């Protein structure tokens, strides 16, 4: 069974994504990290296939902070795929920075908040 860790700002949004992924993907275990400060610990414990991290303009979900978490996760689990979720409608500059992180090879994929549930699940399944 593959595991995905969610590092999402809103607990309600995290649970919504969790339920959606469980409906769309078979044989996956979706685990919510309560806060970015616990994400590295969760990744050590569960050794996920992928980490889906939200990026916002607010600490502790800022791009630089999430990239630091990504680096710590990679030291312990170099095979873990990292996907960043950004609200492209709310912050176009941040969305462009996340795209640049993908171009630079710092993350494996990115998703805009406006994607469909099926597309999000397909991306997570295809890493």
Question: Could you describe each region identified by the protein language model?
Answer:
Residues 17-21, 68-69, 94-103:
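Short, aromatic/basic amphipathic alpha-helical patches
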Residues 11-33:
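Two-component/phosphorelay signaling modules centered on CheY-like receiver
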Residues 51-75, 86-89, 94-97:
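Conserved phosphotransfer microenvironments
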Residues 75-81:
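His-Asp phosphorelay/catalytic-motif detector in bacterial-type signaling
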Residues 86-127:
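Output/docking surface of receiver
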Residues 51, 82, 109-110:
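Two-component signal transduction core modules
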Residues 1-19, 115-127:
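Non-catalytic signal-transmission and effector/linker regions of two-component phosphorelay proteins
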Residues 34-50, 58-60:
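Acidic, metal-coordinating helix/loop segments flanking the phosphotransfer/catalytic sites
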